[in-house]
């Protein structure tokens, strides 16, 4: 999969996330995906774990991610992401922040994602 296809996949996945289409998100991930649970300080390692994490998160808040730029990092892809969390009425719970999501791929699917506060760490 080339960089253009990877960018398209991440953009589509971000839209699915913002629309709470969990099964569409899981469809672009390998079965043993590694996904960060930032609040819990752990790494989730399966579709079932990621699904449960997102469904619990969506019950309490409405996180929104907007990828604004992409940088190839070897075989990985780093997305510059504007992120903000809202309540279900649309009131912001957090200020918008910029974070960096680094995606690793296996074949045409996401194998892992990590979150970084700064660009240099994401590209390292």
Model-derived regions: residue spans:
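A solvent-exposed, acidic/Ser-Thr-rich amphipathic alpha-helical stretch
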Residues: 22-74
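A beta-strand edge to alpha-helix "cap/lid" segment located at domain peripheries
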Residues: 1-5, 51-124
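Short, low-complexity N-terminal intrinsically disordered segments enriched in polar/charged residues
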Residues: 1-27, 31, 122-124
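Preference for short coil/turn "hinge" residues that link or interrupt alpha-helices
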Residues: 15, 19-22, 26, 37, ...
